[in-house]
């Protein structure tokens, strides 16, 4: 059993904190800092306990030397300093004398941010392939390892599994503990009825989680791009809507299975002739979609249908928007579901998966009304699917 952070002796210790600070950037400006806010409880606790905190995180996809100019963690370090209201040190390197010296000069309560761990992916992918020498080196910088990056717990990287392999004293941060606690409520001990909502564009991304959820949920509401492949599998015309034709046999199998009766598909759609915010929108029944239009949102009948299921739920888990919420006229379905779920009884456990569904909830200003909003998109789905989670498993081993 992994120790709790509050039971660790961290005063005056060098604590390696793996955080998920992979925030979206536009022209080197952070457009959504919720992942930074999410680690503040752990970070503030470490500072209050007078630990010497050394933060590791990745940012973006770094495949070439040129990419490095766009994905420095310096802008993230500045935002952390703002929220902590204290100075911290940013080291623009991932290893070497400058980093070694900076760590050696730290005082209790100091915070240091190491450069983007994915800089080590150029050119040999040392971070992403969990290079043992890199993991061993990073581990040598600290006394204690705190993993608070749930968003990477489904990955085997040098900055999570690698460090954990070479350091004895380790634990999860408060964020990861919270993520695991809420996800176990779905997987192990849900209050029923348990209603899941799955959206997003591709059914192929979620076949595994659909199979897993059908064993656990009472109702599975499916919307978004993936619903059109489901309709096509039932031999309905979907016009020019998104289709994964190669997944039709799999979807037919799921719909025909004993658990398939738990699946509820949309009854109508808001469609347009083009994937554009200005295309003319019109509502079509699921069995009467024209050849020249594509579905871009669930329709008003479906909103009401989904509401009836959600309003009876004791546990709700939602991953993936049910429409193109970035376009105003195709955002009504996603917004209506977000409002419905956020207005459920405080006794109802409501959990939002990471990624676009979380982005939608924040966009609509409803983020305070959910029991939990996960910081991990892929990790969230893989946990629900029951896949191995290397970033969690490695914390149990000495």
UniProtKB/Swiss-Prot annotation:
Ligand binding (substrate): 20-22, 35, 58-61, 118, 155
Subcellular localization: Cytoplasm
Chain residues that bind ATP: 206, 295, 326, 354-357
InterPro entries in the cross-refs: Phosphoglycerate_kinase, Phosphoglycerate_kinase_CS, Phosphoglycerate_kinase_N, Phosphoglycerate_kinase_sf
GO MF term (any one): phosphoglycerate kinase activity
One CC-aspect GO term: cytosol
HAMAP family named in the record: Phosphoglyc_kinase
UniProt subunit comment: Monomer.
The protein's name in its UniProt record: Phosphoglycerate kinase
Taxon lineage: Bacteria, Bacillati, Mycoplasmatota, Mollicutes, Acholeplasmatales
